[in-house]
Regions:
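Non-transmembrane accessory domains of multi-pass membrane transporters/channels
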Residues: 2-71, 79-84, 189-198, 206-210
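Short phosphate-binding loop-to-helix
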Residues: 91-100, 237-243
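Intrinsically disordered or low-complexity boundary/linker segments at protein termini
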Residues: 1-27, 114-280
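Conserved helix-loop functional segments at active or binding sites
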Residues: 36, 76, 80, 105, ...
Length: 280
């Protein structure tokens, strides 16, 4: 079983990843996630960082400055992680379509994006910030996590997930970041047999961060199918219960996210950083 797992992770470590980011700081966060998710020892994933702007009126000097400003944090993170990184800067009318074209033409295995604000334009970032401020004035008694959930998830995350999940020719990972760093307590939901494919990723995250791993297993999935590893905690339940306070990363399939989390605002407000995976 250990050998099978190593072979699986070795394949992941050679994965060709497109990391698409908008805000400069989010690029560094997504690179840390990708490295933790796919690195196996000294074997790193093959990552291309993509930033897209929709402003076609910028001149070459401005474009060079935008490039430097946009990629500085992720290049710094790549150096710290010793993670090889290619970069690509594109000017396009539609961000999502440009990402899809690159995925299709260059045959990537995995797309990684963030869920906090829309993919690329600074204007969208400013609109999101303005919405948060307006929401805070009307809902000042609510914690920021609740406000972030209502805004970031419902107004932006659904459309982004649906577009890429249904149109991308590869697997998709979407990070809902709550100050994502190096998680120490990871929770993964295995609600069906197909969700067993999440385990190698969750286990690699746990191993690379020296973290604990808790598996929430549906009663419809045979416990023996987990090939459980020492130190893992397994909880068998069909109830969608509160996320433990100490948990700092949730891993969940896109299907289960749609069925459960996306319809429960109270649970959304509790979520720590969450990785939503649609594996193909």
């Amino acid at each position: 079983r250990k050998r099978d797992r190593i072979e699986t992770i070795d394949k992941q470590a050679g994965t060709k990843v497109l990391l698409s980011f908008g805000r400069p700081s989010s690029g560094a966060t997504l690179l840390h996630l990708t490295n933790q998710l796919l690195r196996r020892g000294g074997t790193h994933p093959n990552v291309t960082a993509l930033h897209i702007t929709t402003d076609k009126d910028i001149n070459p000097i401005e474009a060079d400055k935008f490039y430097q400003d946009s990629f500085r944090p992720i290049l710094r993170a790549a150096e710290e992680l010793e993670q090889p990184l290619e970069t690509d800067y594109i000017v396009a009318d539609e961000v999502e379509s440009a990402v899809l074209n690159k995925l299709t033409s260059e045959r990537y295995n995995l797309l990684i994006v963030g869920a906090g604000v829309r993919l690329s334009s600074d204007e969208d970032d400013r609109e999101a910030s303005s919405m948060r401020q307006q929401m805070s004035r009307f809902m000042g008694s609510l914690p920021m996590r609740t406000t972030e959930s209502l805004l970031s998830i419902h107004s932006m995350l659904r459309d982004k997930m649906a577009f890429f999940v249904h149109r991308a020719p590869c697997s998709v990972g979407i990070l809902l970041s709550r100050s994502f760093d190096s998680p120490k307590h990871i929770l993964v939901y295995v609600r069906s047999a197909s969700d067993l494919r999440l385990l190698p990723y969750a286990r690699t995250m746990a191993e690379n961060n020296q973290a604990t791993l808790r598996i929430v297993l549906s009663t419809g999935v045979a416990r023996e199918s987990l090939n459980s590893h020492p130190g893992e905690e397994i909880i068998t339940t069909d109830k969608l219960c509160s996320v433990p306070a100490e948990c700092d990363l949730v891993v969940v399939s896109y299907t289960y996210w749609q069925e459960s989390f996306d319809t429960c605002e109270e649970l959304l407000a509790q979520l720590p950083s969450t990785l939503i995976l649609n594996l193909k």
